[in-house]
Amino acid sequence: MNALRALEQAVLAEGREWTRRRLEAQLQAQSDALPAHCPQSGLPLQDTRWRDLQLHTVAGVVRLRVRHGYAPALERWVCPAREAWGLEAYQRLSPELEARLTYTTTEVGSYERAARMAATWGSPASDGCLHAHAQRLGKAAAQLLLPTPAPPPREPEFSLVIMLDGWMARERGPDWGAGPRKKNPQRIAWHAIKSAVIYRLEQRVETRGGRGLLVEKFAVATPPETAPVDFGAAVQAEARRRGLGRAQVVYLVMDGAVWLWDLADDRLASALKTLDFHHARDHLWAVAHLLHGEGTPEARAWVQPRLKSLRGGREARVVRRLEQLLEAPAVRPPAQQIELEREVRYFQNHRDHLHYQTMEEAGAPRGSGAAESLGKQLQQRLRGCGQAWSRPGLTHLLRLCVLFKNRDDPLLWN
């Protein structure tokens, strides 16, 4: 081994052992000073006794002697030290170690990789241990009451941006464990994860190279098969936490899915709504392909000036030209005519959501790229190669991913 690396590891081990001993001494002193009283009634515990407690911490294993006693009011045995430190019965990991391991679990591609990474920074744990703690905490996360941060005394004016999107998660199907004799087994089931990104427009900056960057953003993601009304409630609740009621303007950007626009009318009716430009572009290209054939120079020549008009504040003209396609007599196959009518109707329904030049002048986004980026980040953890989730396993880990992204994770150990 490299001499410098070996020396550094040795010194780190010495410092780690010093930290472990210091932590052990302070914890033992705290435990000794705690009164052996019932946490509910305040009465002395009955039949008290001393027991060993081994606690795994970031610094290593600390070994303590702690009191136990019976609390008649609770009808159970109580350890005052565990109560004071927020440890559940039989919990072996300290809150700080559990928080670090859980964060690692949400960031890397699997529980096995998380275990290997934890071992590299000196806190070895099995992938089964990480899985058990993630599932327990993910279940607890569903019961959290997330507080609304207090606004600063002199808060400057701001606008809020909300982007809605979704992506597909791979779960175990009804025939996941079926034997080889099962005909046409449905081993995999795909379900949508509805997600959203919320940020203040003033937090949108650019790097020196011109790349967009969000200084601060917040995420919403709900488990598979969450009803749109419940997803809308979750988005509205998070938006309120982030200043929805105080925002000067609320920008809402999303694709053309009907359920998204129904949700917007229900929960965010006063928001300035925009159809994601890239989806509008794709539908305009679909019209060009219907008229001139896919991949032809004529299709490109037809669509380019209309895209320029769409971005240049002439969206009403674009919609009118599309409507004229249906007014002019033309001989088309019935299937092509039906498809063309569907695409034109798409733009008619969104004629008030195509003001891209206005959005650009306000510095607001024209597309929902941040929401798509969130989906890709979550997929890196939740849709890796070979991953097929049970519903509880996916739901609990998804909740933890969102908590850590929003920096609400300390509430799990509060």
Task: Give, region by region, the residue ranges found by the protein language model.
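Short Cys/His-rich metal-coordination motifs, predominantly Zn2+-binding knuckles/fingers
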Residues: 38-43, 58-60, 73-76
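Short cysteine/histidine-rich metal-coordination sites, predominantly Zn2+-binding motifs
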Residues: 52-61, 87-95
